[in-house]
């Protein structure tokens, strides 16, 4: 079945975002006291079973958690990749577009305010450089004027990020299996023996398979505080409320002033998305990594794990005069991986799913060249 024939399956996940246009949730401000809404999990203080349990509780109840002292990705790795990212965005826009042209079908290259969220129907106030881990996607998109070190460091950083993402997925799947076995007895145990290993369905740089993506993001400063306030009144966001398409996202944030603004729905399990508030996600802990569950993994686990809405609000006060930088590593299953559907629904491949979500997010752009290949 083609991606177009399967589009209604993708639409079910996009629908949550689209409803924000009329629900009023997208305009709500964040809770003043939301520090405890997103769990912080310290790898250094936990044994394996307790780590699995804490990760699963956070993933199933909030869909967001922050890792400290996590393996594979060190603070120095994050800082070094941010240095390359910031150098990339310092270049003239025309140079970025020429050196790294965006291709929606390949989900790779440089884009400037192209992403239109279903939740706002407005363009996000950002620019980004997307690296999808496939040689054919990147062969004409690595910025030659930045030298070979940019590509080499980015590949290494993506490799370390994937190892951490796979570890998180394995922990979550192991704990889910443990809990289902405890609830279901011997029959459930036999069923779980046949359950597929989701973590193993992720690769880098394998042609016609790999879909994992690193997105380096720059939210440009505004010319004045008043300009940011005016755009906020018109409904603009730095990134409109959305869920991610992947299995898990590793989000790397700068700690300096002006780099805040990331928020997630605070109590979606309790209140539903239509009635929840927003919770601020801390960005000030050096070396910390924010993780959220994506739609793929939520669908693969029949909704046991929560893919939570999140957004980047418009800056307030003097924040508006600062750039905001972040990086997101999207652990997306290989093209041929079949995403198990909810009971009674069809399955689809990870390739079909990603193409469907690209259409939903870039279909609103007026740039026909962007969408022609999708």
Predicted regions and their residues:
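Peripheral, non-catalytic segments flanking oxidoreductase cores
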Residues: 2-374
């Amino acid at each position: 079945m083609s991606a177009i024939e399967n589009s209604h399956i993708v639409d079910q996940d996009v629908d949550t975002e689209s409803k924000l246009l009329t629900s009023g949730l997208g305009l709500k401000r964040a809770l003043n006291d939301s520090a405890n809404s997103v769990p912080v999990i310290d790898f250094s203080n936990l044994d394996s079973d307790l780590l699995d349990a804490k990760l699963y509780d956070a993933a199933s109840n909030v869909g967001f958690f922050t890792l400290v002292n996590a393996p594979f990705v060190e603070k120095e790795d994050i800082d070094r990749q941010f240095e390359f990212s910031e150098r990339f965005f310092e270049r003239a826009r025309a140079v970025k577009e020429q050196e790294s042209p965006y291709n929606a079908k390949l989900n790779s290259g440089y884009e400037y305010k192209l992403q239109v969220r279903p939740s706002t129907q407005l363009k996000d106030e950002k620019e980004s450089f997307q690296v999808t881990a496939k040689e054919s996607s990147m062969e004409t998109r690595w910025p030659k004027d930045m030298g070979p070190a940019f590509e080499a460091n980015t590949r290494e950083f993506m490799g370390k990020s994937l190892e951490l993402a796979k570890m998180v997925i394995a922990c979550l799947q192991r704990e889910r299996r443990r809990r289902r076995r405890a609830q279901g007895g011997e029959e459930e145990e036999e069923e779980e023996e046949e359950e597929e290993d989701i973590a193993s369905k992720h690769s880098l740089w394998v042609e016609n398979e790999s879909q994992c993506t690193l997105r380096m993001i720059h939210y440009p400063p505004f010319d004045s505080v008043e300009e940011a306030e005016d755009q906020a009144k018109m409904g603009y966001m730095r990134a409109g409320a959305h869920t991610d398409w992947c299995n898990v996202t590793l989000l790397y944030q700068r700690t300096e002033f002006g780099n805040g603004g990331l928020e997630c729905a605070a109590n979606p399990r309790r209140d539903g998305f239509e009635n929840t508030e927003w919770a601020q996600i801390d960005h000030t802990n050096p070396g910390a990594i924010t993780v959220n569950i994506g739609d793929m993994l939520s669908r693969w686990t029949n909704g046991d794990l929560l893919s939570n809405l999140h957004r980047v609000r418009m800056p307030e006060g003097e924040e508006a005069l600062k750039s905001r930088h972040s990086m997101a590593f999207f652990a997306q299953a290989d093209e041929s991986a079949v995403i198990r559907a909810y009971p009674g629904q069809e399955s689809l491949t990870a390739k079909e799913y990603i193409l469907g979500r690209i259409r939903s997010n870039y279909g609103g752009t007026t740039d026909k060249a962007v969408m022609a290949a999708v």
